[in-house]
From Swiss-Prot:
SUPFAM superfamilies: Enolase C-terminal domain-like, Enolase N-terminal domain-like. It catalyses: (2R)-2-phosphoglycerate = phosphoenolpyruvate + H2O. Mg(2+) is required for catalysis and for stabilizing the dimer. Belongs to the enolase family. Signal peptide: none annotated. The modification Phosphotyrosine is found at residues 44, 287. The modification N6-succinyllysine is found at residues 60, 89, 228. This is Gamma-enolase. It comes from Mus musculus (Mouse). Pathway: Carbohydrate degradation; glycolysis; pyruvate from D-glyceraldehyde 3-phosphate: step 4/5. Its cofactor is Mg(2+). Has neurotrophic and neuroprotective properties on a broad spectrum of central nervous system (CNS) neurons. Binds, in a calcium-dependent manner, to cultured neocortical neurons and promotes cell survival. The gene is Eno2.
Length: 434
């Protein structure tokens, strides 16, 4: 079934910034998709097109991207007559029309909005739930419910506190099902709120962009201590582990790292990659930390390779790999990490996101599907993670509707699958063994 109409508009994301929403019509009806946006972005990501008009939304409008869809992409896709089930053909047509390596002509936010809507329409055309359609596009016969990585303490560029490292996450690997994992996560989250309130006062329980708490602490080990205390207090020491997203590119200064980067610059306090690596080793020794994302700058390849060789935990590439096959291939070659963070808007189309995922999995890596800090009510990534069988997803704390929208959709999918539902649990790094 071919596309009858495409219409894009500017809407607002969870931070109050404009983003792109696309309505796509076929004979089966209307299919709507909205595009997320990151705060700490890797320099190698596909280009997110913003208007730059400071008189409007402080320069962050997306009317140019919207116009590219309505005046250029829509007519081309409609006149092509290509069916919405042909995801790769339609995505490739948009890539050809754009003609740039990083989607800078139309903007990755324009191309992705249409690509997501096409995928939803394709599922309806095949009379399949979206997650089954995605599984078919990826050539997967399995469907696996992921372990959620709840971001319960926010720092870095996601919060107004002094904390350098961006996310401290809890992973309920010992849960019996996804629904059970949600309960465990929510209980630890509420316990953590009480722990923080008792230690730092009520105003310390304000939340960051992704729903995690943002107490004004400086020491990263203090955040880990708070999370560990909440896990123990809730009674889930045996069922819960910790993950981190350091987002180290945000505090990389002149070849070194500034763990107090939100204060005025003072080069005398900067530390080397080796010193930072030793700090992570301490974290792994003293806390149940099983996953660290972006431990070093996106171009500090030597530090990545050295650290990954010396630890037995999951090392996740985000700014390093930006969901880009070329960057992933280099990271595989240099043994820089062992897990890909999959963000659809870093690469800018469903087809390329699936290709990036398959490339990582073929090389023995784990894959974690991820939201962005600027999110919408769109739940596409919930279906994506099940269809791609990656076994792990991070989409914020169990707080804020744009985060819960994804988690709630995953609970619905698990319910729909019934006895067929399998939860990744302890095998979140390698769910194919399930």
């Amino acid at each position: 079934m071919s596309i009858e109409k495409i219409w894009a508009r500017e809407i607002l994301d969870s931070r109050g910034n404009p983003t792109v929403e696309v309505d796509l019509y076929t004979a089966k009806g209307l299919f709507r998709a909205a595009v997320p946006s990151g705060a700490s972005t890797g320099i190698y990501e596909a280009l997110e097109l913003r208007d730059g008009d400071k008189q409007r939304y402080l320069g962050k409008g997306v009317l140019k991207a919207v116009d590219h869809i309505n005046s250029r992409i829509a007519p081309a896709l409609i006149s092509s007559g290509i069916s919405v089930v042909e995801q790769e053909k339609l995505d490739n047509l948009m890539l050809e029309l754009d003609g740039t390596e990083n989607k800078s002509k139309f903007g990755a936010n324009a191309i992705l909005g249409v690509s997501l809507a096409v995928c939803k329409a394709g599922a309806a055309e095949r009379d399949l739930p979206l997650y089954r359609h995605i599984a078919q596009l990826a050539g997967n016969s399995d469907l696996i419910l992921p372990v959620p990585a709840f971001n319960v303490i926010n720092g870095g560029s996601h919060a107004g506190n002094k904390l350098a490292m961006q996310e401290f996450m809890i992973l309920p690997v010992g849960a019996e099902s996804f629904r059970d994992a949600m309960r465990l996560g929510a209980e630890v989250y509420h316990t953590l709120k009480g722990v923080i309130k008792d230690k730092y006062g009520k105003d310390a329980t304000n939340v960051g962009d992704e729903g995690g708490f943002a107490p004004n602490i400086l020491e990263n080990s203090e955040a880990l201590e708070l999370v560990k205390e909440a896990i123990d207090k809730a009674g889930y020491t045996e069922k819960m582990v910790i993950g981190m997203d350091v987002a180290a590119s945000e505090f990389y200064r002149d070849g070194k790292y500034d763990l107090d980067f939100k204060s005025p610059a003072d080069p005398s306090r900067y530390i080397t990659g080796d010193q930072l690596g030793a700090l992570y080793q301490d974290f792994v020794r003293n806390y149940p930390v099983v996953s660290i994302e972006d431990p070093f700058d996106q171009d500090d390849w030597a530090a990545w390779s050295k650290f990954t060789a010396n630890v037995g935990i999951q090392i996740v590439g985000d700014d390093l790999t930006v969901t880009n096959p070329k960057r992933i291939e280099r990271a595989v070659e240099e043994k820089a990490c062992n897990c890909l963070l999959l963000k659809v808007n870093q690469i800018g189309s469903v087809t390329e996101a699936i290709q990036a995922c398959k490339l990582a999995q073929e090389n023995g890596w784990g894959v974690m599907v991820s939201h962005r800090s600027g999110e919408t009510e769109d739940t596409f990534i919930a279906d994506l993670v099940v269809g791609l069988c990656t076994g792990q997803i991070k989409t914020g704390a169990p707080c804020r509707s744009e985060r819960l929208a994804k988690y709630n959709q995953l609970m619905r999918i698990e319910e729909e699958l019934g006895d067929e539902a399998r939860f990744a649990g302890h095998n979140f790094r390698n769910p194919s063994v399930l």
